[in-house]
From Swiss-Prot:
Residues 1-141 form the Globin domain. This is Hemoglobin subunit alpha-D. It comes from Branta canadensis (Canada goose). GO terms for biological process: hydrogen peroxide catabolic process. The keyword Metal-binding applies.
Length: 141
């Protein structure tokens, strides 16, 4: 459960991410494909090479969804409902993969933000990503 402090910290973090979110989304996906190659199976029609336009485009979508989730933090289920339906019913993505992408996004933020990515931000963002993953997995039940 995200506290009021967590939400405040997330807003501060997302201000730092603004302007870089597309780049960070792309890098998180590229990192996931290298670190967890089994995730590539969900993208058989993509060129998965680093710098691929398809990966960049999907990274942009991931970042936009996270940005929307940050803005709609008090109503994640409604904000992510369409995305949850898409991943559960159409794409049939194993929900365990949401955690893998979350880990990769955490690494990207740590690399790019350095000391500005405080332990408090890391903890709040981890809780947030867990909440997002839980909402995305709701339709699987």
């Amino acid at each position: 459960m995200l506290t009021a402090d967590d939400k405040k910290i997330l807003a501060q973090l997302w201000e730092k991410v603004a302007g870089h979110q597309d780049e960070f989304g792309n890098e998180a996906l590229e990192r996931m494909f290298v670190t967890y190659p089994q995730t590539k199976t969900y993208f058989p029609h993509f060129d998965l090479h680093p710098g691929s336009e398809q990966v960049r485009s999907h990274g942009k979508k991931v970042a936009a969804a996270l940005s929307n989730a940050v803005k709609s933090i008090d109503n994640l289920s409604q904000a992510l409902s369409e995305l949850s339906n898409l991943h559960a019913y159409n794409l049939r993505v194993d929900p365990a993969n949401f955690k893998l992408l979350s880990q990769c996004f955490q690494v990207v933020l740590a690399v790019h933000l350095g000391k500005d990515y405080t332990p408090e931000m890391h903890a709040a963002f981890d809780k947030f990503l867990s909440a997002v993953a839980a909402v995305l997995a709701e339709k699987y039940r």
